[in-house]
Regions:
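Conserved ABC transporter NBD signature motif
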Residues: 62-73
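Short catalytic/signature loops enriched in Gly
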Residues: 140-144, 234-328
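A short, proline-enriched helix->beta-strand linker immediately N-terminal to the Walker B motif
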Residues: 168-172
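A short, flexible loop at the N-terminus of ABC-type nucleotide-binding domains that lies
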Residues: 2, 11-24, 55-61, 78-81, ...
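P-loop NTP-binding/switch modules centered on Walker-like glycine-rich loops
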Residues: 54, 175-179, 183, 187-265
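ABC ATPase NBD coupling module
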Residues: 74-91, 109, 117, 239-244, ...
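ABC ATPase nucleotide-binding domain helical subdomain, centered on the C-loop/LSGGQ "ABC signature"
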Residues: 120, 124-139, 146-147, 242, ...
Length: 328
């Protein structure tokens, strides 16, 4: 297994109390596989990715669990050892490329800096590699565009530059945090196709952070659904779309607009909002928003358990435990 996260806990001490942003998250990513981490804002998915990269900002801290990458305990590495992993073996691309690129440096030089940080290449050789990576990600006239500043490029081109930078040192794992949110639909499709094709070409694992299940259906192999810092369901992508088990997953799927729906049909909306992490419900965190909630849900916190008859998927719901998911 390339990446294995077990019972990960991340906390943020605040004046109001302790925020458990990630609370016992477990999942894995293998080489050549795309695992999508899905959830609303505040679900803990981005904090999970930052924990894997060891980029948590103070006062955030990992308070429990383990992160194993390619056989190494990420949490036990020194900062110098982690710097040799970050950017070289694990790379990350972010939601808004304009804020990730330095506006006063040419994009080619920014890729060169990433390459020289992790290799012994001289500037000329590193620039040749940077130009080649720009070509790989589909930027036309890469020799010329390497001399451009970020503001001279469109949003889609800037995201391609970020992908070129992330892949310049041949990482084994790519973490993509909402890589298409700031782009229009046509460019979104191009970037997703690019990530998929590069995954196939380099046999790298991809950890895709997103709230968009439409994106998930296009590129993911497996899905991890998060809510309030916990994993509530894991499944192969075909299983999840064919038969979602957790009411939250079902709500996310039902809220996707479909072309075949009647214009007069009201779009489904999950009622309420994500609860304050300082004041979670006593039982299941989703109980106040769940249409299938019953008394046990308000008293007890369900555990993430294997689904009977489907050993490769899990669900955190009493309905599934009791065999009452009603074949949804």
């Amino acid at each position: 297994m390339l990446l294995e996260v077990k019972d990960l806990k991340v906390e943020f001490p605040t004046r109001q109390g302790l925020v458990k942003a990630v609370n016992g998250v477990t999942f894995s990513v293998d080489s050549g596989e795309t695992v999508a981490i899905v959830g609303e804002s505040g679900s803990g998915k981005s904090v999970t990715s930052l924990a894997v990269m060891r980029l948590l900002q103070s006062p955030g801290r990992v308070s429990g669990g383990s992160i194993t990458f390619d056989g190494a305990d990420i949490l036990a590495l020194s900062e110098n050892e982690m710097e040799s992993v970050r950017g070289a073996k694990i790379s990350m691309i972010f939601q808004e490329p304009m804020t990730s690129l330095n506006p006063v440096y040419r994009v080619g030089d920014q890729i060169v800096e990433a390459i020289q940080t992790h290799t012994d290449l001289k500037y000329k050789e590193a620039m040749e590699r940077a130009v080649e990576m720009l070509r790989v990600v589909g930027i036309p006239s890469p020799e010329d565009r390497a001399n451009d500043y970020p503001h001279q490029m469109s949003g889609g081109m800037r995201q391609r530059v970020m992908i070129a930078m992330a892949l310049s040192c041949n990482p084994k794992l790519l973490i993509a945090d909402e890589p298409t949110t700031a782009l229009d639909v046509t460019i979104q499709a191009q970037i997703l196709d690019l990530i998929y094709n590069l995954r196939e070409k380099f046999n790298m694992g991809v950890m895709l952070i997103t709230h968009d299940l439409g994106v998930v259906s296009e590129v993911a192999d497996r899905v991890v659904v998060m809510y309030c810092g916990q994993v509530v369901e894991t499944a192969r992508v075909d299983q999840l779309f064919e038969r979602p088990l957790h009411p939250y997953t079902l709500g996310l799927l039902q809220s996707i607009p479909r072309l075949e729906d009647d214009d007069s049909k009201r779009l489904y909306m999950i009622r309420g909002s994500v609860p304050n992490p300082l004041h979670l419900p006593a039982g299941c965190p989703f109980s106040d928003r769940c249409d299938s909630c019953f008394e046990r849900c308000r008293r007890e916190v369900p555990e993430l358990r294997p689904v009977p008859g489907s050993p490769d998927r899990t669900c955190r719901c009493f309905l599934v435990e009791e065999g009452s998911d009603d074949d949804r």
